[in-house]
Structures are given as C-alpha cells and as structure tokens.
UniProtKB/Swiss-Prot annotation:
Organism, scientific name: Levilactobacillus brevis (strain ATCC 367 / BCRC 12310 / CIP 105137 / JCM 1170 / LMG 11437 / NCIMB 947 / NCTC 947)
Residues annotated as binding (6S)-5,6,7,8-tetrahydrofolate: 110-113
TM annotation in the entry: none
Function: Attaches a formyl group to the free amino group of methionyl-tRNA(fMet). The formyl group appears to play a dual role in the initiator identity of N-formylmethionyl-tRNA by promoting its recognition by IF2 and preventing the misappropriation of this tRNA by the elongation apparatus.
Enzyme class name: transferase
Phylogenetic classification of the source organism: Bacteria, Bacillati, Bacillota, Bacilli, Lactobacillales
Keywords annotated in UniProt: Protein biosynthesis, Transferase
Protein's recorded name: Methionyl-tRNA formyltransferase
Amino acid sequence: MTSVIFMGTPQFSAPILSSLIDNGYDVLAVVTQPDRRVGRKHVLTASPVKQVAVAHDIEVLQPEKISGSSEMARAIELAPDLIVTAAFGQFLPTKLLKAAKVAAVNVHASLLPKYRGGAPVHYAIMNGDSETGVSIMFMEKKMDAGAVLAQRAIPITDQDDVGTMFAKLSDLGRDLLLETLPKLLAGELTPVPQDESQVSFSPTIKPEEERVDINLSARMIDCKVRALRPFPTAHIYLNGVRTKLWHVTVLDQKTDLQPGAVVSRDKHHLAIATGEQGVLSLDELQPAGKPKLSITDYLNGTTDALTVGEQVAE
C-alpha cells in the first residue's frame, strides 16, 4: 500500500483527500492550517481537510508555520512514499519535500505555467479567460514551478463564479490525481518542464483590489464580480456608500453617459454606465451594514433619487 502525507486546507482540498482514502492509499497524516474563528460569532472551526481526517482517525498536524516546526519533524519522521499537496497555503522546505521516498506532488488549480500563486481561479475569471484547468506537478522550492505530470482543461462559462469553479476544479483535480499517481509510481510518466517565458502569477487578492473600477468595460466588471463571488466580494461606492456587488448583468446596449451615471431606472431595475460606453444592470447589492438585497428591495428602501444621468457610482 502506498503511504501518503496529505497537505491542504480549504474545501477545494477535502474531496481530494477523501478520494485518496477511498482508493486505498495509506494516509499516514494530514497537515493543515490551525483551526480559525469564522463567522460573526467567531466560532473556532476546523478546516475542511481536518474534518475529513478526524472522521477517518488520521493523525492531524497543524503548524502555524511549517518550516522548522515540530510538525515538520513529525512529517519527515513518517517517511511517506508520497507527499500530496492541494491548496496548503505555505511554502514547503526542501528538507520536507525530500522526505517523500517517491515524490512530492501538488494539485494546482490552473494550466501551468499560467497563474502560479495563491489565487489562480480568481484571476482566470477576472481576466475573462474562456477556460482554466488543473495541473499535477512535482513540487520544488520555487513556487508552483515544478515539472508538470498531467493537465486537464475545463471551460469557464459566463455564469461561473469562483465558488462554482472551485467545486468543478476540485472534482477535476481529484480525478486527474487518481489517474496520475499509479502512472507515476509505475515510472510511466515523462515530466514536462514549464516554459518560463509563459509564466504568469496570481497573487492573493488584496483588499484594495476588491473595489471595482467603474471605467472598466461592463464585461470586465461582470468578470470581476464573478471572480470575487462568494469571496472576498467586489464593491463600488453607490451614492457614497460602500456597496458589495453580488450579481450584475451586462446589457446589450451602448451609452454616451459618463461611467457611473444612471442609464435607466424603474421600480425593479437600475442600470449604470461603464467604461467603453457599456451598460451594466445592478441585480443584487449589499450596502454596508445591511443584508443582501435584490435591486427591487434596494430601490424600495432607498431615499436617493437615482435619476437618469445622475452620477451615482464610483
């Protein structure tokens, strides 16, 4: 039986761990981030990966930082055949990677060398890409730079957001890993080095990047809204109030009004001008301090005039 140490944290990683367990791999231990307080009530919550491990009585290691930790020493002591990572969220020291007797491999949610880094799904949607995918690659000290063992692509639809794509890519990564590991163990794969001239990066989204530039085209604003939904969520300032954008629609029309101006409005509809003469319907909003609101509920509750031509969004 092939022994594995699995390293991962979010929901993306949990089905991948479950599949290894269900398919006869001997998971010696799971390394995941420490429990975090979540939600308005700040409830201390185990990561999805830890929850799977606990359910199967697998040893759980939770270092705040893996490098130099006692948890790293324990992982090295276990001497697994494979180290498998999926969205673990930390750099792994070379000493740890070399503890794997066969290989240390990573399930990365992009078509490498495109979108190395921590937010590949967000960037694929935000940039309006028509497809993304999963890469299974050797791990090395440099971030997401190892030779690729397998790749598979899937389309990004106009309805997809980061939530739906994470779910699709998790399933894809699970299936591709299960196909790849037996071939790796049998020595049947030829690793393909990444083309360094094609490398791009997807660093973690910063809070200031969550604000929508109303001068972008309507399509690119829609892409940004979907790329940041359900987390961390895009926002604009609507009549001076920070307002999250949950759902918008690109309208098939043009306007000469300045970006941020009201193009049309009735009891159930509000559309604003964007860059490149675009028009964007605001369908579901969340003003600061309030719950999500349909545009109908928002318009019923606002005292703002929101008249056609009025500059309201920035």
